[in-house]
A protein has these predicted regions:
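Boundary regions of SH3-family modules and the immediately adjacent low-complexity/disordered segments
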Residues: 1-34, 38-50, 57-60, 68, ...
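Mid-sequence acidic-hydrophobic segments that form the walls
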Residues: 65
Length: 167
C-alpha cells in the first residue's frame, strides 16, 4: 500500500537517499509551502513587500504530506506533496502514524469542493478554516460528529457536512 501511495508523488526516488526516514503528516491549517525556510515574506521590490517569491503553493487543511527533514532550529519541515516539495512551518502540520495517515486518506466518506473558495464557520476554540477549489475533504462519521458537538455543547446544524480536520 505504501508503494502505491508513493507512486503518486512526482520524482519520488530521484535524489532521495535510502537511509532517510520518512514521517507522515497532515496539514492542520491553510499554509504556505516555501522554497526556502524564511519566516517573513521575501519580496522582489520594496513596492511589493508581501509578494513572497519563496512561496511555491498553498496547502489546505487535511492534505497528506511526507516529511523528510527538520530544520536545525526544528521549526520547519522539508516535505513532499504530490507535485511540490519544500519547507513548511511546524505549527501548520501534525505528524501522524502510518496507520492514521492511510486511514484518513483512504476514507470512503469524502467531499470534493467545486467552489473557488469555501470557509467554515468560526468556532471559538478552533477558529475558521479556508479551503479552495479541488480540495478533498474527509467527512466525519456519525460517532465523531456526535462526540464533537457534545464536547462543544451545541446542536448539529441541519444541511451541513461535518468535516474531519486533523488538530
Amino acid at each position: 500500500m505504501l508503494k502505491e501511495f508513493l507512486s503518486y508523488f512526482q520524482d519520488f526516488k530521484k535524489g532521495i537517499l535510502a537511509n532517510i526516514l520518512i514521517s507522515f503528516g497532515l496539514i492542520n491549517d491553510r499554509s504556505a509551502l516555501k522554497a526556502l525556510p524564511f519566516k517573513y515574506p521575501l519580496g522582489i521590490t520594496p513596492n511589493y513587500p508581501f509578494h513572497d517569491i519563496t512561496r511555491l503553493t498553498t496547502l489546505s487543511p487535511g492534505e497528506p504530506i511526507l516529511i523528510y527533514r527538520r530544520s536545525f532550529k526544528l521549526n520547519w519541515y522539508f516535505v513532499q506533496k504530490s507535485f511540490y516539495s519544500g519547507w513548511i512551518n511546524t505549527k501548520d502540520l501534525i505528524e501522524v502514524s502510518k496507520k492514521t495517515f492511510f486511514d484518513y486518506n483512504k476514507s470512503a466518506r469524502t467531499l470534493i469542493l467545486m467552489e473557488s473558495k469555501v470557509c467554515t464557520e468560526e468556532l471559538p476554540t478552533i477558529g475558521k478554516f479556508h479551503f479552495q477549489m479541488g480540495d478533498k475533504l474527509v467527512l466525519a462519521n456519525e460517532v465523531e460528529t456526535n462526540r464533537f458537538y457534545f464536547k462543544m455543547n451545541t446542536l448539529f446544524p441541519e444541511g451541513c457536512y461535518p468535516v474531519k480536520i486533523p488538530l
